[in-house]
UniProtKB/Swiss-Prot annotation:
Subcellular location as annotated: Endoplasmic reticulum membrane; Golgi apparatus membrane; Endoplasmic reticulum-Golgi intermediate compartment membrane
Function: Possible role in transport between endoplasmic reticulum and Golgi.
Spans annotated as Disordered: 1-33
GO cellular component annotations of the record: COPII-coated ER to Golgi transport vesicle; endoplasmic reticulum membrane; endoplasmic reticulum-Golgi intermediate compartment; endoplasmic reticulum-Golgi intermediate compartment membrane; Golgi apparatus; Golgi membrane; intracellular membrane-bounded organelle
Topological domains annotated Cytoplasmic: 2-138, 196-203, 250-271
Protein name per Swiss-Prot or TrEMBL: Protein YIF1A
UniProt gene name: YIF1A
UniProt source species: Homo sapiens
Residues modified as Phosphoserine: S12
PANTHER family associated with the record: PROTEIN YIF1A (PTHR14083:SF2), YIP1 INTERACTING FACTOR HOMOLOG YIF1 PROTEIN (PTHR14083)
Modified residues (N-acetylalanine): A2
Topology Lumenal: residue spans: 160-174, 227-229
Topology of the protein relative to the lipid bilayer: Multi-pass membrane protein
């Protein structure tokens, strides 16, 4: 009996194994795919094969090596030209700021009328960095203010349903072009007036870039309170920036050696400083009026 029961169990196992699979409900149309569970293609294997084939291609390897060498050579050339035309140590001076300096400088730009001493402080014939001297110009605030202005302009255009990448790019490029033109005009004016001072291109770029702070406040006030608030903020920030520019550039632009010079030259240098200050409200208005409606 045990023999027959065992034989029956063994035979049932063979019959279970030999039982045909039920016919599929649908015909297999995935002729181009490999036989994976569920009928999905072997994407991992195909990608691995493609990558291995690409890496094994001699032409691809040559192209990758050539592109890498060009990128490395271009990077070296950029660093070389940057060190040639721009002193990195001098550039670091204009970014030597801290949180306390940024807060105080922003307050000085908005309300400069109570500030008394406007002379740049020196230590061993070298100017102190901005974080140690509130009167020292910096490029950190102008850079961050420019980025904030571009973002705020995009938000203002989006609120007015006028946003597009082209319009935002035009706003950013126009703001940069105006600052560059202003710096070039100041350099030309200083050259024609034969002014000997410690002002460099970085100094002029910093003083010209401080207008972005007033532009941000004007646009933000206009978005919150309408056109009336915009014009009030524009008048306040423009007058504050004009006062700041005149007091900051007066000693540096006139130069200590020009005090005993001819009177016409002193007047020309003074007119140059006043002209640079008077030009600020026009630029602020031109770059912000279309953002507030």
């Amino acid at each position: 009996m045990a023999y027959h029961s065992g034989y029956g169990a063994h035979g049932s196992k063979h019959r279970a194994r030999a039982a045909p699979d039920p016919p599929p409900l649908f015909d297999d149309t995935s002729g181009g795919y490999s036989s994976q569970p569920g009928g999905y293609p072997a994407t991992g294997a195909d990608v691995a094969f493609s990558v291995n084939h690409l890496l094994g291609d001699p032409m691809a390897n040559v192209a990758m090596a050539y592109g890498s060498s060009i990128a490395s050579h271009g990077k070296d050339m950029v660093h070389k030209e940057l060190h040639r035309f721009v002193s990195v140590s001098k550039l670091k001076y204009f970014f030597a700021v801290d949180t306390a300096y940024v807060a105080k400088k922003l307050g000085l730009l908005v309300f400069p009328y109570t500030h008394q001493n406007w002379e740049v402080q020196y230590s061993r014939d070298a100017p102190l960095p901005p974080r140690q001297d509130l009167n020292a110009p910096d490029l950190y605030i102008p850079t961050m203010a420019f980025i904030t202005y571009v973002l705020l302009a995009g938000m203002a255009l989006g609120i007015q349903k006028r946003f597009s990448p082209e319009v935002l790019g035009l706003c950013a490029s126009t703001a940069l072009v105006w600052v560059v033109m202003e710096v070039l005009a100041l350099l030309l004016g200083l050259y024609l007036a034969t002014v000997r001072s410690d002002l460099s291109t970085f100094h002029l770029l910093a003083y010209s870039g401080y207008k972005y702070v007033g532009m941000i406040l004007s646009v933000l006030t206009g978005l919150l309170f309408g056109s009336d608030g915009y014009y009030v903020a524009l008048a306040w920030t423009s007058s504050a920036l004009m006062y700041f520019i005149v007091r900051s550039l007066r000693t540096a632009a006139l130069g200590p050696d020009s005090m005993g010079g001819p009177v016409p030259r002193q007047r020309l240098q003074l007119y140059l400083t006043l002209g640079a200050a008077a030009f600020q409200p026009l630029i602020i208005y031109w770059l912000t009026f279309h953002l507030v409606r």
